[in-house]
Amino acid sequence: MKLSFTKVSLTNILILFNCLFIIFSMIVLTFGVIPQIYLLKFANILHGVRPSIFPIVCFTGSFVIIVACVGIIGLMKGGKCLLTMHIIALIIATIIDISTATLSAIKQNEFLTKAGQVLNDSSKLYYKNRLYATEFDLMHITFKCCNVKNDYSLLGTLHLIPESCTHGIEFYKQQCNEPLNKYVRYYIDILIYLCFIFGFIKLIYSLFTFTQRQRIFSEKTPVA
């Protein structure tokens, strides 16, 4: 009965780890989805600019949930082929996560620069595009910033600084890409830590499971 207990215990531990991977992936998905939903409020003036880590972790998070379910089925049903596919897929997802987190850590100012360029271009259409004006007003009020300057139209009419750029008699002097980047960096930093920490856990799990796969499927449960 000792062999049977060892096999059952090992299988249960691996199943537990896969359940934890599902929970972890849901957490990663949450931190990847929330900022993207928020940035949709400014989708037009940002022209879809967003940190690449957000859509990537959403994809890998969803992918890992499926992979973990496949692993659980493989462990419960004794499917060696399923478990092998599970290990390979998990390693691929882990490599993608760690690579993305590394690049995001290196290119910390990438979104700041791109957002600044796009917002400056979009601000020129503030008085020409109602939708742009609405999104800029929301951004100004939310982040206490201003990206629209005094401007003369083709007819020589002076466009004053928008009311959304003011607070009482004071004007917001800060460019909007800076507070927007601060908001985005909060989620990026969390995702970087999560990707590294849980990425290494998944990598260790994958290597351990790979080395133990023969033991999992070769031991036979004695008949009582």
Curated annotation (Swiss-Prot):
Keywords, comma-separated and alphabetical: Glycoprotein, Membrane, Transmembrane, Transmembrane helix
Q: Which residues lie on this side of the membrane: Cytoplasmic?
A: 1-12, 74-80, 211-224
Query: Where found, per UniProt?
Result: Membrane
Q: Which residues are glycosylated?
A: 120
Extracellular topological domain ranges are 34-52, 102-189
Topology in the membrane? Multi-pass membrane protein
Q: Which Pfam family, an example, fits this chain?
A: Tetraspanin
Q: TM segments?
A: 13-33, 53-73, 81-101, 190-210
Alphabetical GO CC annotations of the entry are: membrane
Keyword Metal-binding included in the entry's annotation: no
Keyword Transmembrane helix annotated: yes
CDD domains under this entry?
tetraspanin_LEL
Give the protein family: Belongs to the tetraspanin (TM4SF) family.
What name does UniProt use for this protein? 25 kDa integral membrane protein
